[in-house]
């Protein structure tokens, strides 16, 4: 099978690796893969070393004539079976480029919300009539997309991004950096804060936690609107604002558990995956794909979205029972390895592509 990918690989290594390694594995299995991306992306050297053809081609805007011309020439002359676009810039350009070629256009969707039939821009991406199939990062995203597509709802499918535990094995950040010891119980929340992240719910939940050994680390940017709420928390002195960090996986490995109080918009949260890979359990909400990663009462806790008291209750269950933290953490790591592994992702992609080619 001959496949052309249009995506960006200029993000953090851990964020692009599940996607990038999938295409490398396809080449190892005998498929021909070409990737159109920024030529200076860090992953380009690895792609080429592994036999992936790379074209230095990335659109500057949603309709970029130069990109369309380059991709059309590649699709036409290369006789590709599948072309696969990953974002709001690459999908429209790939759609125009695929006109007059035999390539089936597949798109990727990674978040819930934001796709509407009344929005003209949606017809440049997932609602474009050229789209033959949509691959979603979670069942929550799939169900959301199916509400909005006009036809072929059965060709909107879930394929989880695959992971390998070895990708995430990192040394733990030292607790002493935050003035903490092994006697303390630590929860970490990593986010680039916006309203959908539910930080107010988390801070409200701290009003219902009463354990002097419990500390909360808030990792990332954008917490400023919540400073007054944090000051009003009874455990304000044990809430640590540590800013943007390059070692988030190491912090997750150090924490006893991680918390994600999101109220909307989540696809399949990477912070939960990084925590699972390092054997760290989670407290999450029912929004988006989080419940697909966390088995409630087995690998962590899933609580109703926006319910601060329920969130606090789940945290308290872990704070007061370290054996449960250990039990859930082991189970979380095993679940990631079993249900979200890279080999399954490649298998499901190829099966879906083959299905589209038969139609």
Where are the regions a protein language model picked out?
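Short hydrophobic beta-strand element within catalytic cores of glycosyltransferases
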Residues: 36-37, 281-284, 294
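Glycosyltransferase donor-sugar binding loop
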Residues: 35-41, 163, 190, 194-196, ...
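A short helix/loop element that forms part of the nucleotide-sugar donor recognition site in Leloir-type
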Residues: 168-180, 329, 348
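A conserved mid-protein helix/loop that constitutes part of the nucleotide-sugar donor-binding site
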Residues: 13-24, 185, 189-208, 266, ...
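Short His-centered aromatic/hydrophobic patch
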Residues: 85-91, 109
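Conserved acidic donor-binding segment of nucleotide-sugar-dependent glycosyltransferases
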Residues: 295-297, 301-308, 317-323
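Nucleotide-activated donor-binding/catalytic signature segment of Leloir-type glycosyltransferases, i.e.
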Residues: 227-245
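Donor nucleotide-sugar binding/catalytic pocket of nucleotide-sugar-dependent glycosyltransferases
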Residues: 55, 130-147, 151-169
């Amino acid at each position: 099978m001959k496949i052309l990918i249009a995506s960006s690989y200029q993000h953090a290594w851990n964020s692009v690796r599940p996607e990038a390694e999938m295409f490398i594995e396809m080449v190892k299995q005998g498929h021909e893969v070409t990737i159109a991306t920024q030529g200076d992306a860090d992953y380009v050297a690895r792609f080429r070393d592994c036999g992936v053809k790379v074209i230095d081609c990335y659109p500057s805007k949603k309709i970029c004539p130069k990109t369309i011309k380059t991709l059309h020439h590649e699709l036409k002359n290369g006789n590709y079976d599948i072309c696969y676009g990953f974002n709001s810039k690459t999908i429209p350009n790939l759609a125009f480029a695929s006109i007059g070629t035999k390539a089936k256009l597949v798109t990727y969707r990674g978040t819930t919300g934001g796709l509407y039939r009344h929005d003209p821009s949606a017809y440049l991406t997932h609602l474009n009539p050229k789209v033959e199939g949509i691959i979603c990062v979670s069942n929550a995203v799939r169900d959301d997309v199916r509400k909005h597509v006009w036809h072929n709802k059965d060709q909107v499918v879930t394929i989880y991004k695959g992971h390998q535990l070895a990708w995430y094995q990192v040394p733990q950040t030292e607790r002493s950096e935050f003035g903490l010891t092994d006697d303390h119980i630590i929860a970490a929340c990593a986010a680039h804060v916006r309203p959908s992240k539910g930080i107010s719910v988390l801070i409200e939940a701290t009003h219902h936690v009463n354990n002097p050994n419990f500390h909360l680390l808030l990792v990332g940017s954008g917490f400023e609107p919540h400073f007054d709420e944090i000051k009003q928390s009874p455990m304000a002195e044990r809430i640590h604002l540590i800013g943007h960090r390059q070692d988030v996986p190491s912090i997750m490995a150090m924490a006893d558990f991680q918390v994600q109080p999101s109220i909307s918009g989540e696809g399949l949260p990477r912070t939960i995956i990084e925590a699972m890979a390092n054997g760290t359990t989670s407290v999450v909400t029912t929004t988006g794909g989080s419940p697909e990663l966390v088995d409630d009462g087995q690998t962590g806790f899933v609580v109703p979205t926006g319910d601060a008291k329920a969130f606090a209750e789940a945290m308290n269950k872990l704070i007061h029972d370290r054996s449960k933290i250990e039990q859930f953490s082991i189970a979380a790591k095993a679940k990631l390895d079993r249900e979200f592994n890279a080999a399954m992702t490649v298998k499901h992609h190829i099966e879906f592509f083959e299905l589209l080619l038969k139609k």
